Amino acid sequence: MNKSYFIGLMSGTSMDGVDAVLVKFSGDTPSLIAHHSEEIPAALLRNLQKLCLPGNDEINRLGHLDRAVGKLFAKAVNTLLDKAGVDKLAVIAIGSHGQTVRHMPNLEMGFTLQIGDPNTIAAETGIDVIADFRRKDIALGGQGAPLVPAFHQQVFATPEHKRIILNIGGIANITYLPGNTEAVTGFDTGPGNTLMDAWTQYHQDLPYDKDGAWAKTGTTDDKMLLHLLSHPYFSLAAPKSTGRELFNQAWLEQQLAEFNHLSDADIQSTLLDLTCFSIANDTLALSTMGEMYVCGGGAYNTELMCRLKQLLPHYKITTTAELGINPQWVEGIAFAWLAMRFHLGLPGNLPAVTGANRAAILGGKFSAL
């Protein structure tokens, strides 16, 4: 059977599910053939959230969750292929990002750790797996993130326009495509949905604030917003990346000590503005006008999109759907693309973005045989 497909697997810092995509490439141009989102079971989600918090972790828990996430990713692949009516023998490789449980690239011995055992995925799908995409970049002195700007450049760049590709998952990141000979720039701007989701889960017993409806009922506290924006991360120069190790519920509770007079809704509104202002500040530092295309879960938050448009009046702001890719599936397709790059022996990182000392082929192969 002729092998012609790649599969991309992604679970981001929001931990809102495993996205699986079936992709066919013509050169670097992807065609999305099928997609599937696999829910993370509640017990597994709770254990993953515990593992992501700074502290002393049990090796047993890590090992168990590594296998459990691998099995969940494999289930997502098998369901995807069933839905698409595609035989596993037609798939060249799976590109699996895994689930990040630590991302600490700025230590003296920086590291990043994604779990979701690729051996388990290969064994339970019968398909070769390309995984462990971030650690080569860190070994070369880089941040290991963000990796998606290389994909954004290949798929979304145009010489006619300055474009920002904004991904809002748990953490938000931007890719600046200048449309000329300037180097592509990309970095994490700070919290995306992670703080808003944590606050909503704690006070509303809901997984997230749908459409930003709860935030819309509150009033942003300017003093609290300025306090949050004074965090040193926001003034760091690129390359930079961050994660739940820094911006999490425990950190938020520490910041709220002098703001306990605010209502829960006012705090939610302020957290939404923290995301929007940090994105807008970094965007304006790159260019005062242009086009912005949003992907990730934040693209569906109507209040967030509305506030971004108010902060960036000289930007045309819409979602990546206008460029032909549904915002939910952009990152999954990016990891199918990275698997394709590995298969062809081509580099997958942009040193100007990550800070690595050279471009490199990312990932390792885990054979199904």
Swiss-Prot record:
Pfam families, per database record: AnmK (PF03702)
Alphabetical list of Gene3D superfamilies matching this protein: 3.30.420.40
Annotated pathway: Amino-sugar metabolism; 1,6-anhydro-N-acetylmuramate degradation; Cell wall biogenesis; peptidoglycan recycling
Known EC number: 2.7.1.170
Keyword field: ATP-binding, Carbohydrate metabolism, Kinase, Nucleotide-binding, Transferase
Catalytic activity: 1,6-anhydro-N-acetyl-beta-muramate + ATP + H2O = N-acetyl-D-muramate 6-phosphate + ADP + H(+)
Domain of life from the UniProt record: Bacteria
Stored CDD domains: ASKHA_NBD_ANMK (cd24050)
Gene Ontology process terms (BP): 1,6-anhydro-N-acetyl-beta-muramic acid catabolic process; amino sugar metabolic process; peptidoglycan turnover
Residues reported to bind ATP: G12, T13, S14, M15, D16, G17, V18, D19
GO molecular function ontology, one term from the record: phosphotransferase activity, alcohol group as acceptor
Role noted for this protein: Catalyzes the specific phosphorylation of 1,6-anhydro-N-acetylmuramic acid (anhMurNAc) with the simultaneous cleavage of the 1,6-anhydro ring, generating MurNAc-6-P. Is required for the utilization of anhMurNAc either imported from the medium or derived from its own cell wall murein, and thus plays a role in cell wall recycling.
Membership in a protein family: Belongs to the anhydro-N-acetylmuramic acid kinase family.
Protein name in the entry: Anhydro-N-acetylmuramic acid kinase
Organism: Shewanella piezotolerans (strain WP3 / JCM 13877)
